[in-house]
Design a protein with these regions (language model features):
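Thiamine diphosphate
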Residues: 1-117, 120-217
């Protein structure tokens, strides 16, 4: 057991990671991850760089994030806009159960730190309860998913905004084949090949996210 102190949770995980363990820890709400920023920014993210690849800091930090649960200011924050700019850390942000399992299993097998964001608005939602391909399913990082195909506009999104984007398209009652939706699945690395191939077709892109407008993802 660990104390409900984010700096201690991540700091303990750092010590375990550099001594051969693979810790999987949870920050109860992304809103409180900031007290662990010294450990994440200066220790976890820089371990490989500072040691010239002699040391790594493999761990998985699970972080529930996002709004839509009436959690007010301390239980609704989105943190992807910050962490996507932080080098040295992989970021997963699934939109459904199958992707969550495949990405989490892959994260546990990687030799680098992973921040695994879980949108609270997806918990216990029927539309997020997807079937897994098989019990050994692994989903590689950096491989997005083409949700629906279209040739007029590309929507690039992730997490809970995938469903919100699909609902918006349905609400507008647009003909099929106009809107293309891409679910990134991971924010670091990003599937640039999938994005580029879609934009070559549509020539227009809309990024849908839940973080700050200024300096967001």
């Amino acid at each position: 057991n660990s104390p409900l102190a984010e700096s201690s949770i991540v700091g303990t995980a750092v010590g375990m990671a550099v001594t051969g363990y693979k810790p999987v820890v949870e920050i109860q709400f992304g809103d409180y991850i900031w007290t662990a920023m010294m450990q994440i920014r200066n220790e976890v993210a820089t371990m490989r760089y500072r040691s010239n690849n002699a040391w790594t800091c493999p761990m998985v930090i699970r972080v529930p994030v996002g709004g839509y649960i009436h959690g007010a200011l301390c239980h609704s924050q989105s943190i992807d806009g910050y962490f996507i700019h932080l080098p040295g850390i992989y970021i997963a942000y699934p939109s459904c159960a199958a992707d969550a399992k495949g990405l989490l299993k892959m994260a546990c097998r990687m030799d680098d730190p992973v921040i695994f964001m879980e949108h609270k608005g997806l918990y216990r939602q029927g539309y997020a309860a997807t079937e897994e391909p098989d019990s050994d399913y692994l989903l590689p990082f950096g491989k997005g998913r083409l949700v629906i195909e279209g040739d007029e506009l590309t929507i690039v999104t992730w997490g809970a905004m995938v469903q919100k984007s699909m609902e918006a398209v349905q609400l507008l009652n647009l003909p099929d084949g106009l809107i293309e939706i891409i679910d990134l699945r991971t924010l670091n690395p990003i599937d640039l090949d999938l994005i580029e191939s879609s934009i070559e077709k549509t020539s227009k892109v809309l990024v849908v996210h839940e973080d700050n407008i200024t300096n967001g993802p």
